[in-house]
């Protein structure tokens, strides 16, 4: 394992950015991978029913996030603060399948999945996140 954090008040993107900054790397995240993006949750986000912390998190991290064509409601949800989020764990790509198998083996972990990959820091320097 290279790094791990609990996804709480800074949301997935805020915590991912902190991890990337600590290692001076870039991250590419699959915006559709997190399980929280159900149609009902997305509809609430489209209606603007979002916690105030989402706006603070977006302000903190948006300059380092390339959202590409990811819809605004999905972006907002990835910035949303969580009070009891999951874990974000970074491992070597070669170790990912074994970690997933171990986590899911006995049923105590209800969900685990690959949500992105680590790359070198951007040409402009510093950590960045690209959403795909």
Predicted feature locations:
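Glycine-/charge-enriched secondary-structure boundary and capping motifs
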Residues: 1-132
């Amino acid at each position: 394992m290279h790094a791990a954090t609990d996804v709480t008040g800074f949301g997935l993107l805020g915590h991912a950015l902190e991890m990337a900054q600590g290692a001076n790397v870039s991250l590419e995240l699959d915006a559709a991978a997190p399980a929280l993006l159900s149609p009902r949750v997305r509809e609430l986000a489209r209606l603007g029913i979002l916690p105030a912390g989402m706006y603070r998190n977006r302000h903190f991290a948006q300059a380092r996030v390339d959202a590409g064509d990811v819809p605004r409601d999905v972006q907002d949800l990835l910035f949303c603060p969580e009070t009891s989020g999951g874990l974000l764990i970074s491992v070597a790509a070669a170790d990912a399948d074994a970690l997933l198998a171990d986590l899911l083996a006995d049923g105590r972990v209800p969900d685990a999945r690959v949500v992105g990959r680590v790359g070198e820091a951007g040409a402009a320097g510093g950590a960045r996140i690209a959403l795909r």
